[in-house]
UniProtKB/Swiss-Prot annotation:
Species for this entry: Aspergillus niger (strain ATCC MYA-4892 / CBS 513.88 / FGSC A1513)
Designated name of the protein: Protein pxr1
Bias (Basic and acidic residues) ranges: 152-163, 224-234
Family: Belongs to the PINX1 family.
Gene: pxr1
Positions of region (Disordered): 1-23, 144-263
Length: 285
């Protein structure tokens, strides 16, 4: 408070330590405790408690208040000298050891122990103690092989190759093998024959087109050549598309990409529509 604050007169009582209150026997606390079986000098709580052995003479005395005038936490101790011993005590202990008849080797061992204790105390006060906790040993995790699902077209081709390997050729004399093979092998052979026929027909068509004589009209020849090239490219694209469909999978958008794709598609549709553009730009049609 400053000088402008109201003046307060404080009178020092005759009992500054408040000993009259602690020694009085007419108070409410003393009466209720004595009614519960407490007597002056005894401890509070059950006498047959598990922690009764931990009580000392200080437990029966009055509670003492310590003024906290620092910013340390509760229970923290102020800084003290780590050695906390009078100077020259080590030399005095060594002198007493020599007088008692101890050898120099024993005195050096004791001095080394004292030095180690001093260093440990200094390190504990200077730096926080580090405790290492073992976190176990590093071990290699078991790698589970990833099973990739093959497309149906490749799987069927492999089965057909296996069946064709077991089927004997037309020139071979093995009649028993043809009897053992079921209807599946016959179907696979028919499919292979049809594929080979189609391939041969395509090659024959190409040869015929190349062996035809050149026509007199240059425009007709150019048209025919372009048509041939377009047919060949179409056939190649169809064959490549059939193989690529079997091998590659459709990449479907997942998560937020689905909503983003829809939003972009709606924007494109709105830009392509004249009515929506007029509504956006507030133009009367």
């Amino acid at each position: 408070m400053g000088l402008a604050a109201p003046r307060k007169k404080i009178k020092i009582s005759h009992d500054p330590n408040n000993t009259n209150w602690s020694r009085s026997t007419s108070g409410f606390g003393h009466k209720i405790l004595s009614s519960q079986g407490w007597t002056p000098g005894s401890f509070l709580g059950a006498r047959n408690a598990a922690h009764a052995e931990m009580f000392t003479a200080a437990s029966a005395s009055h509670i003492k208040v310590v003024l906290k005038d620092d910013t340390l936490g509760l229970g923290a101790r102020p800084k003290r000298d780590p050695l906390n011993e009078p100077t020259g005590l080590d030399a005095f202990k060594g002198l007493l050891g020599r007088l008692n008849g101890k050898s120099d080797a024993d005195l050096q061992v004791e001095q080394q122990k004292r030095d180690n204790v001093k260093l440990a105390r200094y390190a504990a006060t200077k730096w926080q103690a580090v405790t290492f906790i073992s976190g176990g040993l590093l071990a290699q995790e078991k790698t589970t092989p990833i099973v990739t699902e093959e497309p149906q077209g490749i799987h069927k081709d492999k089965q057909e190759d296996k069946l064709s390997a077991t089927v004997p050729g037309p020139d071979s004399d093995g009649v028993e093998g043809s009897d053992n093979i079921g209807g599946q092998s016959d179907q696979s052979i028919k499919k292979k024959k049809s594929k080979s026929k189609n391939h041969r027909e395509k090659k024959d068509r190409k040869r015929k087109h190349t062996e035809e004589p050149e026509s007199t009209d240059s425009g007709n020849t150019n048209k025919r050549s372009t048509e041939k090239k377009s047919k060949a490219t179409r056939d190649d694209e169809e064959s490549s598309s059939t193989t690529s469909k079997g091998l590659s999978r459709e990449r479907r958008p997942m998560g937020r990409h689905v909503f983003r794709g829809r939003h972009i598609a709606q924007k494109k549709a709105a830009l392509m529509d004249e009515k929506s553009l007029n509504e956006i730009f507030m133009v009367k049609s």
